[in-house]
Amino acid sequence: MEDYTKIEKIGEGTYGVVYKGRHKTTGQVVTMKKIRLESEEEGVPSTAIREISLLKELRHPNIVSLQDVLMQDSRLYLIFEFLSMDLKKYLDSIPPGQYMDSSLVKSYLYQILQGIVFCHSRRVLHRDLKPQNLLIDDKGTIKLADFGLARAFGIPIRVYTHEVVTLWYRSPEVLLGSARYSTPVDIWSIGTIFAELATKKPLFHGDSEIDQLFRIFRALGTPNNEVWPEVESLQDYKNTFPKWKPGSLASHVKNLDENGLDLLSKMLIYDPAKRISGKMALNHPYFNDLDNQIKKM
């Protein structure tokens, strides 16, 4: 830690306090995440350290790079590249009645998908994607932060400040207690974020797991074994769930064209096996008119 100085506290992350810092010799500005673990006495589990070390290998223009992993007084500090703005803050800063430019929505979605495809190809899931951990710079680049941390540390139910971890972007298979899940969980989250890029509003903003599920069911219909084989045998599926009929996504997401709505609907397919993959999403006609500069990134 002697290589870095803390400049200021910039927030509370899922796992602990987040600081803006500076490398003493190079002057590089960094983000320092202090990881606060449940069992402080035992120090950092070796499995977590192994997982985290692997994340240093994830180098991609749309992934926030993990530059260093440091220990101090049995506390773990993760040193990341610094970006000052997250997607949530940016969406909140757009004046009422105005929306993000549709070409920027497209560019951001494409970049998010490029980042996710890169990680999925290396068998790393995110599991906790949300606008707060999508960081943007002033050149139009968006980067995914906190990759792989869920696997290293688990996803707490509450942040250590007792703020509840958001459920709005969580996939139905996770909400229904599926023990086995894979890369489609991240695609679902990106779908909900896509809708929010277009409308500035969370697509499904539940305040409990059951409220979250019911908001999804009201919009997309209550799933059954016909549309999603074996869903009825998932741990938290109840035959007593109200049977809503599928509605139209277009009524919830006003600012997307036909191609955008088609891609969104494929990202929000209930059955994870039928949900579009990141790779297939990148080749969807929605991106046909995207600037080639972005495609080459």
Curated annotation (Swiss-Prot):
Single GO molecular function: RNA polymerase II CTD heptapeptide repeat kinase activity
Modified sites of kind N6-acetyllysine: K6, K9
Location of this chain's protein in the cell: Nucleus; Cytoplasm; Mitochondrion; Cytoplasm, Cytoskeleton, Microtubule organizing center, Centrosome
Taxonomy, superkingdom: Eukaryota
EC number, as in UniProt: 2.7.11.22, 2.7.11.23
N-acetylmethionine: residues carrying this PTM: M1
Recorded GO CC terms: centrosome; mitochondrion; mitotic spindle; nucleus
EC category name: transferase
Domain Protein kinase span(s) in chain numbering: 4-287
Location of Phosphothreonine modifications: T14, T141, T161, T222
Regulation acting on activity, per entry: Phosphorylation at Thr-14 or Tyr-15 inactivates the enzyme, while phosphorylation at Thr-161 activates it. Activated through a multistep process; binding to cyclin-B is required for relocation of cyclin-kinase complexes to the nucleus, activated by CAK/CDK7-mediated phosphorylation on Thr-161, and CDC25-mediated dephosphorylation of inhibitory phosphorylation on Thr-14 and Tyr-15. Activity is restricted during S-phase in an ATR-dependent manner to prevent premature entry into G2.
UniProt modified residues of type N6-succinyllysine: K245
SUPFAM superfamilies recorded: Protein kinase-like (PK-like) (SSF56112)
Catalysis performed (reactions): L-seryl-[protein] + ATP = O-phospho-L-seryl-[protein] + ADP + H(+); L-threonyl-[protein] + ATP = O-phospho-L-threonyl-[protein] + ADP + H(+); [DNA-directed RNA polymerase] + ATP = phospho-[DNA-directed RNA polymerase] + ADP + H(+)
Residues with Phosphoserine modification: S39, S178, S248
Position(s), cross-link Glycyl lysine isopeptide (Lys-Gly) (interchain with G-Cter in SUMO2): K6, K9, K20, K139
Sites bearing Phosphotyrosine, chain numbering: Y4, Y15, Y19, Y77
Binding site for ATP: I10, G11, E12, G13, T14, Y15, G16, V17, V18, K33
CDD domains (alphabetical): STKc_CDK1_euk
Gene3D superfamilies xref list: Phosphorylase Kinase, domain 1 (3.30.200.20), Transferase(Phosphotransferase) domain 1 (1.10.510.10)
Disulfide bonds: none
Subunit and interaction comment: Forms a stable but non-covalent complex with a regulatory subunit and with a cyclin. Interacts with cyclins-B (CCNB1, CCNB2 and CCNB3) to form a serine/threonine kinase holoenzyme complex also known as maturation promoting factor (MPF). The cyclin subunit imparts substrate specificity to the complex. Can also form CDK1-cylin-D and CDK1-cyclin-E complexes that phosphorylate RB1 in vitro. Binds to RB1 and other transcription factors such as FOXO1 and RUNX2. Promotes G2-M transition when in complex with a cyclin-B. Interacts with DLGAP5. Binds to the CDK inhibitors CDKN1A/p21 and CDKN1B/p27.
Protein's job: Plays a key role in the control of the eukaryotic cell cycle by modulating the centrosome cycle as well as mitotic onset; promotes G2-M transition via association with multiple interphase cyclins.
PANTHER family: CELL DIVISION PROTEIN KINASE, CYCLIN-DEPENDENT KINASE 1
UniProt-recorded name of the protein: Cyclin-dependent kinase 1
Species the sequence originates in: Pongo abelii
Gene: CDK1
